Amino acid sequence: MAIKDWHEEDRPREKLLNLGAEYLTDAEILAIFLRTGSKQQSAIELARSLIDHFGGIAELLAAPKEAVLACHGIGTAKYAQLLASLEMGKRYLNSELKSGNSLNRSQVVKDYITTQIRRESKEVFAVLCLDNGLNLLDYKVLFVGGLSSCSVCVKQVLRHALEQGASQIIIAHNHPNQDATPSAADIHLTQTLKLACEAIDLRLTDHIIVGRNQTLSFAETATAPF
């Protein structure tokens, strides 16, 4: 049965408008973005099949283009709608944080960074520049590496932070197709950068690693040197 033939109170759009987003399942939210299903499936059924196949909305949005387009019922138009929804969320978060909402909680930081770099197929290294109140001054990917490593220039990180007038920074990188467990090289870089920051009265607040299914905070897990 097509969604338009459902009782009004069961239709995702009507539920969203009448009750609020918190009353919708992940599949119902996704169905609204998909707008239509296929000849064999309603938008809800298509959304459920995508979530089941990839393991969740986050995993779907992080999946390679080829993997998503290989799913029955998904063409380039629907894939573009999914990418646009992700980009809208990223831009909303960026706008909110730059308008004065501070990164004063570890989960907020992890959520923000995860949306920024989780889809990257190569390892990237990013820097968040913050003022004393933990308000975001600037976010930038400074280095792009390969599938399993990324060379980082400590001097360039410090120069960028000073140019932005930062009082403190948070660094972040991803582990494409791996978990978020920090390597010995990750820990060594963090220790080196923390000492370099202290030498110029700049605080390194945290190091975030975005893995395949997890995001890790050095500060939250008391990983050296925090």
Swiss-Prot record:
Top-rank lineage group of the source organism: Bacteria
Entry binding sites for Zn(2+): 173, 175, 186
Biological-process GO terms, alphabetical: proteolysis
Motif stretch (JAMM motif): 173-186
Domain MPN residue range list: 102-224
Keyword check for Signal: no
Keyword S-adenosyl-L-methionine: no
Keywords of this entry: Hydrolase, Metal-binding, Metalloprotease, Protease, Zinc
GO molecular function list: metal ion binding; metallopeptidase activity
Gene3D superfamilies referenced in this protein's UniProt entry, alphabetically: Cytidine Deaminase, domain 2 (3.40.140.10)
InterPro entries: MPN, RadC_JAB, RuvA_2-like, UPF0758, UPF0758_N
Recorded family membership: Belongs to the UPF0758 family.
UniProt protein name: UPF0758 protein PsycPRwf_0491
Species annotation: Psychrobacter sp. (strain PRwf-1)
